[in-house]
């Protein structure tokens, strides 16, 4: 809970800076890249998390890795290092994306199907969801053969379960 609050607070501040610099998308990509590196590179993670390594040394290391970034992006990475919040990068990125989606009327939708839908089926689903919600839809599709057929759509807290598995479970319970 506290980690989510921290992520939200930092994400809001970073988003505000990104808006004022007109680089919202670029900064998201930067933060996402930092998160990927933090999650996959043990040496990087160890270095930025190690309490005995001075912050200035951590910043120098980050500058060597991210030196090609524009100054505002690099300063945000430095700020997160200064505040010992780089370890919270996953939560910050998730909250940043939520803010971006909310401000740009984008809805994150997860669709689970028994088999991979065609491009046309995905496009039709996106079109119907956009028409229903009045928002642009970011569709993430996953496959789960255990649902047998049909699909499950998750929009925020709402779940629309049209799977054969659920229908069979309903019949079995009655």
Swiss-Prot record:
Subunit-structure text: F-type ATPases have 2 components, F(1) - the catalytic core - and F(0) - the membrane proton channel. F(1) has five subunits: alpha(3), beta(3), gamma(1), delta(1), epsilon(1). F(0) has three main subunits: a(1), b(2) and c(10-14). The alpha and beta chains form an alternating ring which encloses part of the gamma chain. F(1) is attached to F(0) by a central stalk formed by the gamma and epsilon chains, while a peripheral stalk is formed by the delta and b chains.
Domain of life: Bacteria
GO molecular function per UniProt: proton-transporting ATP synthase activity, rotational mechanism
A cellular component annotation (GO) from this entry: proton-transporting ATP synthase complex
One example of a Gene Ontology biological process annotation: sodium ion transport
Protein name as catalogued: ATP synthase subunit delta, sodium ion specific
Protein's cellular compartments: Cell inner membrane
Family label: Belongs to the ATPase delta chain family.
Keyword Transport: yes
Pfam families membership: OSCP
Function comment: F(1)F(0) ATP synthase produces ATP from ADP in the presence of a proton or sodium gradient. F-type ATPases consist of two structural domains, F(1) containing the extramembraneous catalytic core and F(0) containing the membrane proton channel, linked together by a central stalk and a peripheral stalk. During catalysis, ATP synthesis in the catalytic domain of F(1) is coupled via a rotary mechanism of the central stalk subunits to proton translocation.
Membrane-topology annotation of the record: Peripheral membrane protein
